[in-house]
Regions:
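Long, highly hydrophobic alpha-helical transmembrane signal-anchor segments
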Residues: 1-13, 72-86, 92-97
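Helical transmembrane-bundle signal
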Residues: 11-22, 66-73, 99-106, 110
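Membrane-water interface of transmembrane alpha-helices
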Residues: 20-38, 109-113
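Membrane interfacial helix-start motif at the N-side
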Residues: 42-63
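Alpha-helical membrane-embedding segments
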Residues: 64-80, 123-125
Length: 125
């Protein structure tokens, strides 16, 4: 049972972190463009306008994805409460894989929004 609880907790980390980071990215983006913290891609670092837009868009997207992932993550895990450690491990691998794809996929959506809103020099269209 301890393994199930540990894996349950681990599976909840990504959606919860997405919710927390999403809130802070959209409401309190880093004040300056930097290479340490924040949504850092070539396009997002063109100027402060692209920087703020990227953080607001990504933050809102992560809030939606965090909520979207949280409920199924909980529901999927419930039937595994008395399963073997192997079954729980495989379930965790699949759930966290899906969550990881959601995080990476968010980059595609943010970059598309940046390219739709700004030209290649970071000037609004």
């Amino acid at each position: 049972m301890w393994f199930y609880i540990m894996m349950f907790t681990c599976n909840l980390l990504i959606p919860i972190v997405m919710l927390i980071c999403g809130f802070f990215m959209s409401k309190y983006p880093p004040k300056e463009i930097n290479g340490i913290i924040g949504y850092r891609t070539t396009m997002s670092r063109k100027n402060m306008d692209t920087w703020k837009f990227a953080h607001d868009y990504c933050g809102k997207l992560w809030l939606k994805l965090g909520l979207l992932l949280l409920t199924p993550t909980i529901i999927i895990q419930i039937p595994f409460s008395h399963s073997s450690e192997n079954a729980i491990g495989y379930m965790t691998l699949i759930v966290e894989g899906i969550q990881f794809v959601a995080i990476l996929g968010s980059i595609v959506f943010v970059e598309r929004a940046l390219k739709k809103t700004f030209d290649e020099n970071g000037i609004r269209r």
